[in-house]
A protein has these predicted regions:
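Membrane-proximal basic amphipathic "stem/tether" segments
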Residues: 1-5, 345, 349-364
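Short Cys/His-rich Zn2+-coordinating modules
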Residues: 2-6, 327-333
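Radical SAM enzyme [4Fe-4S]-AdoMet core and its adjacent flexible, acidic
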Residues: 12, 30-41, 52, 83-86, ...
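Local cysteine-cluster metal-coordination motifs and their immediate loop/turn environment
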Residues: 18-26, 342-355
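C-terminal accessory segments of extracellular proteins
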Residues: 326, 331, 339-341, 347
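N-terminal pre-triad scaffold of radical SAM enzymes
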Residues: 1-23, 55-62, 268, 272-281
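A broad structural signal for short, well-ordered beta-strand segments within beta-sheet-rich domains
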Residues: 3-6, 113, 182, 267, ...
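Conserved SAM/AdoMet-binding glycine-rich loop
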Residues: 8, 16-19, 26-30, 40-122
Length: 364
């Protein structure tokens, strides 16, 4: 595989963020967070020629940060679109000036290559409960500016995670999106169906700032439709032991549920031609394994230690060189087997049963 086979690149251009969403890996791990960003020059080094960009999708998102906090964000979008790269990015929409957003809206209108997902989980009364530290009035101003710049021809979607506390504002948000000329979508995340979150916000009361704590829950029809499948995969991960039989005194592993599970994996890299570039400029098959690296889940750092410190760093290697590395080229797929020395159960949990764990987005 080489860059010509890659169709989609997810870019985490910064690990910085203006928000403090309680379910975010960044908020939960501030003690180990390193605020890192890459520049327009870094992006040009990674994608130096049109052939590496033309016709590909560049998703500005990531695990740890919001792309618009990166000072070079707009220049990156201009560079990629000038080389016929399609830019889709997710943001809480709470930063930048009105003029910045007007320019981005105009770029979307003029090129047809910019699509913004405004991740706004509520309306005036509730968005800040999960999107902690964001200000709805600023977000509304920025969405309005983007629509103004796009003159009705911009591409944008208001994506709304439906929790128990914000469900009642769905109609207000839906109507607001329609006025702006945006699509409207609801999103369900597996982690929200598996966990409750504690939100710490502040509000003014009698002229003083008062702390307010909210428990964020997702119940009933708002839960992910494949929750039971992921629970089944979790049970497999926890209990799997290879069944053995002996033939001529030679132990043989019996084909059991493992085959069903492994054959159902749909890998972002291997099956969909996608790569993920983290804010520290390391390259991964997906955001999930970068998240594992960030937290050192399943001792992933120790499992990769034999490759050296810069084996997947785009500061030291090209995309093609990293794709040719034995781990990307062969070991990744082999390691889905639970008995493999470099096995990461994250691959099963997030991508087995054909990506049961991953977000469900319903565009209306």
């Amino acid at each position: 595989m080489n860059i010509s086979n890659i169709k989609k690149i997810e870019l985490e251009i910064t690990s910085n963020c203006n928000a403090a969403c309680p379910g975010c890996a960044r908020t939960q791990n501030l003690d180990i967070l390193k605020v890192e960003s890459f520049t327009i020059n870094d992006l040009k080094r990674m994608f130096p020629v049109k052939e590496h960009i033309d016709g590909k999708m560049f998703k500005f998102c990531g695990v740890l940060g919001d792309p618009i906090i990166n000072e070079d964000c707009l220049e990156m979008i201009k560079y990629l679109t000038s080389n016929n790269g399609y830019c889709q990015f997710s943001t809480n929409g709470g930063l930048r000036s009105r003029e910045w957003w007007i320019e981005l809206g105009k770029l979307s209108k003029d090129t047809g290559l910019v699509d913004v997902s405004f991740c706004v989980d509520g309306h005036k009364e509730t968005n800040h409960i999960y999107r902690v530290n964001t200000v709805f009035d600023n977000i509304a101003r920025n969405m309005e500016a983007y629509a103004y710049g796009g003159e009705g021809r911009q591409q944008a979607t208001w994506i709304y995670i439906v929790f128990d506390h914000n469900e009642y504002e769905l109609d207000a948000a839906r109507a607001h999106a329609e006025r702006l000329g945006f699509k409207f979508a609801t999103r369900t995340g597996m982690r929200n169906s598996m966990h409750d979150w504690i939100s710490q916000t502040k509000k003014k009361e009698n002229g003083k700032l008062v702390k307010e704590t909210s428990v964020i829950t997702t119940t009933g029809t708002k839960e992910h439709s494949k929750k039971a499948l992921v629970q089944d995969l979790d049970a497999f991960i926890k209990t799997y032991k290879p069944q053995m039989m002996t033939t001529n005194n030679i132990p043989i592993v019996v084909v059991d549920k493992k085959a069903e599970v492994l054959n159902s994996i749909k890998c972002k890299l291997i099956h969909e031609g996608e790569i993920f570039i983290a804010s520290n400029q390391t390259m991964w098959p997906c955001c999930f394994l970068w998240d594992s690296q960030f937290k050192n889940k399943e001792n992933i750092i120790e499992k990769m230690a034999e490759y050296g410190g810069d084996w997947n760093s785009l500061k030291h290697h090209t995309i093609d060189e990293i794709l040719a590395h034995p781990w990307f080229d062969k070991i990744l797929g082999e390691s889905w087997d639970p008995i493999h020395s470099k096995h990461l159960s994250r691959c099963i949990r997030t991508c087995a049963y054909n990506k049961a764990y991953q977000n469900e987005i319903n565009v209306e």
